[in-house]
Amino acid sequence: MSSGNSYLKNLKKLRNKKDWTQERLARESGISFHTLIKIESGRIKNPRLETLIKLAKALGVSIDKLVS
């Protein structure tokens, strides 16, 4: 799946909309806090589809909404 970096802005926006910290999103999605930091900072340029699905599920949105 090629999502480019469109997920970066959406991820932060959706997390902030829920008023969640990075720690909370990491806990709710089941991914490590350090991985989430790397994703949000762009150090992980192409997160695995499985990771994006976990994040979308935790945020209560479709994968399409996360990466669009």
Give the ranges of each region predicted by the language model.
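Short alpha-helical elements of helix-turn-helix
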Residues: 5, 9, 33, 49-52
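Key DNA-contacting residues within the recognition helix of helix-turn-helix
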Residues: 12, 37-38, 67
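Short, Lys/Arg-enriched C-terminal cap helix and immediately downstream tail that follows
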Residues: 14, 48-49
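Alpha-helical residues within the helix-turn-helix
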Residues: 16, 27, 57
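Short alpha-helical DNA-recognition segment
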Residues: 20-38
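DNA major-groove recognition helix of helix-turn-helix/homeodomain DNA-binding modules
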Residues: 50-65
